[in-house]
Regions:
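Phosphate/nucleotide-binding beta-alpha loop and adjacent structural elements of enzyme active sites
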Residues: 2-159
Length: 159
């Protein structure tokens, strides 16, 4: 399997190099993106959160056009203040889905964990997060908000 992965990476013009005796390999995916995707791509950032991916893409590409979608209002407002002057970034306070609707969205103490999915009580993951944020498992969901959901196809037709 390792040889196959190395062969595929080599086909893209990159070489895997050992970084330790324990046979770990280092691949710089930023370089892979920069060299194999056009210089000014159109990027859809689904779940923009606070704009971490936008910052990464701005560092990798010259002038990417980024359409970011973030349904959590506080995170959207943060991104808006950060990127409002960049004409190549289109921020959308909306979620994407398979149909246009209003849907309940679980807002968590760590907003990048917020989701349409229900949080499963009693899991190790939830116990750790609750402890990290000084709350109970039930308290980890800070609110449930109705958010607008649209289909990507509809967004592209309109924009």
């Amino acid at each position: 399997m390792k040889k196959l992965v190395k062969k595929i990476i080599n086909k893209f013009g990159f070489e895997l190099k050992k970084i330790s005796q324990k046979k770990k390999y280092q691949i710089n995916f930023d370089d892979l993106l920069k060299n194999k995707i056009c210089k000014n791509p159109v990027i859809f950032d689904i779940g923009g959160n606070k704009g971490q991916s936008i910052e990464k893409y701005l560092n990798i590409f010259n002038q990417p056009i980024i359409h970011s979608f973030e349904p959590v209002k506080t995170d959207f407002d943060y991104m808006y203040q950060k990127f409002k002057n960049n004409k190549n970034i289109f921020l959308n306070n909306i979620a994407l889905g398979d149909k246009t609707e209003k849907k309940e969205f679980n807002i968590t103490a760590k907003t990048d964990n917020s989701s349409f999915n229900k949080i499963n009580l009693g899991t190790d993951w939830l116990k750790e997060r609750s402890k990290e944020f000084g709350t109970t498992e039930r308290g980890y969901i800070t609110s449930i908000q109705k958010v607008s959901v649209i289909k990507l196809d509809d967004y592209c037709k309109d924009n």
